[in-house]
Each structure stands twice: as structure tokens, then as C-alpha cells.
Amino acid sequence: MSMITITESAQQHFGKLLAQQPEGTNIRVFVVNPGTQNAECGVSYCPPEAVEASDTKIELELFDAYLDELSLPFLDDAEIDFVTDKMGSQLTLKAPNAKVRKVSDDATLMERVDYAIQTQVNPQLAGHGGNVSLAEITEDGVAILQFGGGCNGCSMVDVTLKEGIEKELLAQFAGELTGVRDVTEHARGEHSYY
């Protein structure tokens, strides 16, 4: 698990802010609504009395950063940076796993494929108001997907599925997945019109 990265410039920025706070004050990094589409990463001051026994402490040169137990898995690979450009300076927080908990390498194929869909496929479909979810993985390794939102009934679903999603998932899960199908295509039987 690669922990959160707080860049040198961000550490200097927090160091200056903390110098104006009561002694012993550090920072807390957290995620509000973790594991949901509304997840947001935040930073706040953390006075000594606010430190919990279950917190994870990251010791830095100028201060310590505390992460609460609930936020911890969602802050994996997160980065806090302090960027200065022509427009001024700003703190940037990137937490790629805030909306979806990162799965471990030994997770089931279903969990790993679902994670890939939530973090790689759905952000691309969101621009069209669409989404896709994993319905099942068949015994012969075919991932059955359920399209929703703007994708449902869209004539481009087949192209999106074959050219985009299937290529991406088969490359990522080579040797584990044999194909990717739309749930309606998979469910087609003698009762289907075409």
C-alpha cells in the first residue's frame, strides 16, 4: 500500500500555517463520504487532543499528518501538492481511490474487475451521463456488464463495449477474462425478437 504523498512545497506551506497555530498542532487528512461518488478529500488542523489511538501517523520534517482509520484505504495513492503558477498559489488534493476503495491483489476476480470498471471505465462514460456495472462473470470467464444511464438503449453501446471496455479489460485481465458482453446480449434466448 503506497501511502499518501505530501510534496515538499505542500509541507513548506503547511509548516508556515502551523507556525501560527498553538504548539503541538499538526494536520489531519481525511475523506468525507468515502467510497461514494460524492467523496471529497480534505485537510484540517489537528490539535494534540484530537488525535485518536486508531489514527495512522505520518511523520514529516516540519509536522505530523494524521489519517483516520475510516479514510485510510481511500487515501491510498493520494497526493497533496502546493502549486504556484501565474494565477497564484493553490493547494491541490488528488485522491484517486476516494470514491472506490482500492482492492487488494488477492481479491476475487469479480472484485478486481468491478474496481477496474468503477475507476477506469465509468469516469469515461460519465461525460455521456452513462455508467456500467458488473452483473456477473460466467464460468468460462466472460464478464457480463449492465449498461445504465445515458448508455441504456444507446446505439453506440456495441462499439463502446467492443472497442473500448472489452479491449481494456481483456488486456488488464489477460488469462482470466475471455470476453465481455452486455447483459441484454447475454440474456438473449429463443424468446428474443432478433
Swiss-Prot record:
SUPFAM superfamilies: Fe-S cluster assembly (FSCA) domain-like, HesB-like domain. It holds the Pfam family Fe-S_biosyn. [4Fe-4S] cluster binds at residues 151, 154. The keyword Endoplasmic reticulum does not apply. The keyword Heme does not apply. GO terms for biological process: iron-sulfur cluster assembly; protein maturation. Its cofactor is [4Fe-4S] cluster. It comes from the Bacteria. One of its GO terms (molecular function) is 4 iron, 4 sulfur cluster binding. Keywords: 4Fe-4S, Iron, Iron-sulfur, Metal-binding. Binds 1 [4Fe-4S] cluster per subunit. The cluster is presumably bound at the interface of two monomers. Homodimer. Belongs to the NfuA family. Involved in iron-sulfur cluster biogenesis. Binds a 4Fe-4S cluster, can transfer this cluster to apoproteins, and thereby intervenes in the maturation of Fe/S proteins. Could also act as a scaffold/chaperone for damaged Fe/S proteins. This is Fe/S biogenesis protein NfuA. It comes from Photobacterium profundum (strain SS9).
